[in-house]
A protein has these predicted regions:
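PRPP-associated nucleotide enzymes
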Residues: 1-205
């Protein structure tokens, strides 16, 4: 994509806001193509990881060159002016790295509890099949004032994404947008999110 580059306060080189923003029509086309790839490649598993849960396996999407490229391009268009991309443990790491490379920003892994050395910023949350915690570094990475694009693979009950967003707010950052590959609308996860824009490539009622 052609455009004028700028250097942020945190050293990332990215495109100027006006040059980087694609037309709404182009973004819609990217999202529609990515949605087709996700629908075609996703595998479904009943009663996994616990009885009554239907698990969406996006591994084939990530392993397919065309599918992965479509997903990354679609997610990157959600917040072209972000200066940090954050991916939620674990498949969000794959998304975060790809989108950060596309936007020319850094990437931060939002880890599950107990995976980072102290100090950490931590938040507990509930899953559709249990509970867990998420963490980000409490020092070593300057987060105050950062413009964060937050990524995860699936939006189900919404607890994971909401907890991740809370971590960055607590650290003094701004979540400028959040995006997921697949949204299970019947679980109502969107209602648990903050006032940041939330994009889903494929939404299943």
């Amino acid at each position: 994509m052609a455009g004028r580059e700028r250097v942020s306060d945190h050293g990332e080189v990215s495109m100027s806001k006006h040059a980087a923003v694609e037309s709404d029509e182009h973004v819609a086309e990217r999202t529609a193509e990515a949605a087709r790839q996700v629908e075609r490649l996703t595998r479904w598993h009943d009663d996994f990881p616990t009885p009554g849960v239907r698990f969406a396996d996006l591994t084939p999407v990530f392993a397919d060159a065309e599918g992965f490229r479509s997903v990354i391009e679609s997610l990157a268009a959600c917040a072209p002016d972000a200066d940090l991309v954050a991916g939620v443990d674990a498949r969000g790491f794959l998304l975060g790295a790809g989108v950060a490379a596309t936007l020319g920003t850094g990437v931060l892994a939002v880890r599950k509890g107990g995976k980072l050395p102290p100090p950490v910023i931590s938040r507990e949350y509930s899953l559709e099949y249990g509970s867990a915690a998420l963490e980000i570094p409490g020092n070593g990475v300057e987060l105050r004032g950062r413009r964060v694009l937050l990524l995860d693979d699936v939006l189900a009950t919404g607890g994971t994404l909401a907890a991740a967003a809370h971590l960055f707010v607590e650290a003094g950052a701004q979540v400028v947008a959040a995006a997921v590959v697949l949204e299970l609308e019947f679980l109502g996860g969107r209602a648990r999110q903050g006032d940041y824009p939330l994009t889903s490539i494929l939404r299943l009622p």
